[in-house]
Each structure stands twice: as C-alpha cells, then as structure tokens.
Amino acid sequence: MTKKRLLYWLFVVFMVLALVLSAIPIIASDLFRQPYSPMWPHIRRAMDLFRIDPFPVGGGAPPRWPFWREPADAFVYHRDLTLTTSDGVNLTAWYVPAHEPGAPTFLLTHGLLDSKWTMLRLAPWLQEAGYNVLLLDFRGHGGSDHQPASIGPDEVQDVQAAIDWLEAEGVGEQVIGLGMSLGAAALVNTAVQDDRIDALILDSLFADWSDTDFAEGYRLPPDWLVPGVPSPEDLLPLIDIPVFIIHGTADVLTKVDHAHRLYNAANEPKRIWINDSGHGWSAWTYPELHQELVLDFLDQSGLTPLD
C-alpha cells in the first residue's frame, strides 16, 4: 500500500469516527428521552407478569404485587379518561372517585419507564381513606401519546391537564400530588408555576439531575445529554405548601443524600421519612407504615376528607 493510499484510508477512518462521535449525543438522547416505542407498555407488563423489575435496586423489598392491570382488578370503580395538554398531547388516565362528595383529590404520578397502573396499588386505600384519586400516564408512557420525556419540565403540561380536568369536574378544590421519581419532579416543576396543588408527597426524587448516579442501576443519560432539567433543590424554596419527602437508603439510582438536600431546601411545613427500601419502593416495602405516615401528614396539613 502506497503512502498516499494509506493517508486516504486514514482520512476515511477519521471521518467515520468523527461522524459516529458527533452522532452519539443525538442517538443517546433519542434512546433515553424517547424509550417509549408502542411495544414498551407490553414489555413493561410482561416484566411485571414474570416479576422482573426494571430497577433491581435491592433493599429487601417485596414485589409490587398483586398484579393489577385495571382498576377493576383492585375492586375499585373508575372512569377511563383521555386528557389533552396545552401543546396537543393526548394522555390516558384513570379517575377513582371517593365514596362521598367534597373530598380532596390525590394526583398520582409515576416514574420514568412506568405508567399509571404501577401506581394502582395505592388507589384502593386512598379511596377507602376518603379521597378521590386520579392516576395519570405521562407523555411517552402507558397509553399516552409517544412524545419524549423531559425529566420534569414538559410533564408540567401533563399535570396541568389533569388538574384542569379535576377543576372542570368540580373535584379540584384540594389537590395532593404524590409522585415517584420523574413524577415527583413533574409535580415540583408544576407547583412552582401553578398554585392549584395544595401538598406534595415526593418519593425518590433527585435534588439535582446532574448529581444522580445511575451507573449501578438502570442506565440513563448523564446531564450533558439531557440539558435544561431544572433542579428540584432550587425550586422547592419557591414553594409554600406542605412537603413530605420519602426516600430509601438502598436507592442506587438517586442516593439518599438527595432527600436530605431536598428537605433542607423545602419551606415549612415539611416532613421526611427515610427507610431502607430501594428506588420508589417505600410504599411497597412498608405499605402499612407508608399509609399511616401519609395520612398523618395530610391530617397535619388540614387535607383530610370531611366527616
């Protein structure tokens, strides 16, 4: 091979490598911000059916079962909803009404790569405690339109669409947001700009996306691949409603120090519960204690159903 030909092929290899490297952020962003192909809900259901969790983070947690596909499986009456956001995204949701009128409403928001039916186990006891419950599929999740996730900011429109519907139905006077991970971030982002949320229960929330360590669990993009993610640690001081922070010491996706940072940033009244569960597992690892602490928090916050 002549020197000229060698230089030619070296140039070709260099250009190919340059193109590949330049495409990595785009490809990674597409994979991680849009991991929601039409097949994903079916894959996620199969994982639950065979007891495979996408976040195997330990903590001695029992499985998140019984496996309920629909609210009817949980023995609760519900309405199937389709909501439309201000930017035209169609969302699917379930509404579980309280047994008595005039009750506060729980808005349950799931984590990344999950859907409303993974939050379904909370609905029966919340209804029995006297609350309405709305379970929402974020954009790109469950039965909602397959739009990219934004780790908080774009999901604000999803949360607001849910609250708009609650107000139109006359059950949005008192709204309690209970979110896990991505769902908690969306609630915080919403509460900063929308005063229709009366209390926040934040489970496994990151204080700052760029400080999370996902290397030991499910691989998600680093901060430089997901720019513009607001820091809940910076947003909480702007919120003047009761906040309950929940986290597990076995969470390897968002380490427990994030919970302490969030608690320090939040205004009073605030509460924190640290246990030994994994990412988003507190309600399943300690269901009775979780219920007790949530209801006590709401009692102290003046958000209990009327007798």
Located regions from the model:
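Post-His helix in hydrolase/transferase enzymes
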Residues: A283-D296
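Hydrolase active-site cap/lid region
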Residues: F50, A184-I241, I274, W284
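Alpha/beta-hydrolase active-site loop
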Residues: T118, A149-G170
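The serine-hydrolase catalytic nucleophile loop
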Residues: L112-W125, F138
